[in-house]
Amino acid sequence: MKNWKQYLPDILAVLLFAVISFAYFFPADIDGKVLYRHDSSAGRGMGLESSEYYDRTGEVTRWTGSVFCGMPTYQITPRYKSLTALTDVVDIYHLGLPENVWFLFVYLLGFYIMLRAFNFKTYLAALGSVVWAFSSYFLIIIAAGHLWKVMALAYLPPMIGGIVLAYRGKYLWGLFVTSLFTAFEIYANHVQMT
């Protein structure tokens, strides 16, 4: 029982992050409103040809002729069988929260993990996470639809936190956290940010 109680402040912080994330996007979540994101809409348009090809043939194409007179699809509509297992792990990390909510939640949680790796007290790590997550740029890129950038920036702090854990002698935790969030970074598919 004693071991469980030592993690209670961290568990409460994670729950607080979920509540904050829901509260911020409350009107949209309750009313079923959708945030129009230009880049997401344009991305769906760019990937339409390859999606239609997949629906028609069941095969994944690695080339599209609909963008820039032809280009590879690995940046537009990536489909790899190897992503299936990682997608499940990413979904668990997002706690199954609705789309806009989990964007903010992973900003909060990721920075919290990093600050805890730096041995910040729970309340300071939680406060720092709120300040970081609500910086204007992070909310602007959600609204703009730079969703892969959102993911890449959200997974970067915990990846750094894993490296810090390894430097502090917590080698297994450091390896696990760094490996997990490095995989998430690659999964985010945003080369410039990763």
Where are these predicted regions, by residue range?
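Start-transfer (signal-anchor) and selected internal transmembrane alpha helices
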Residues: 1-26
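Membrane-interface coil-to-helix junctions
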Residues: 20-114, 118, 130-157, 191
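Transmembrane-helix signature of polytopic, membrane-embedded enzymes
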Residues: 115-134, 169-175
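Small-residue faces within membrane-embedded alpha-helices
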Residues: 17, 129, 133, 178-179, ...
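Short hydrophobic alpha-helices at membrane interfaces in multi-pass membrane enzymes
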Residues: 165-183
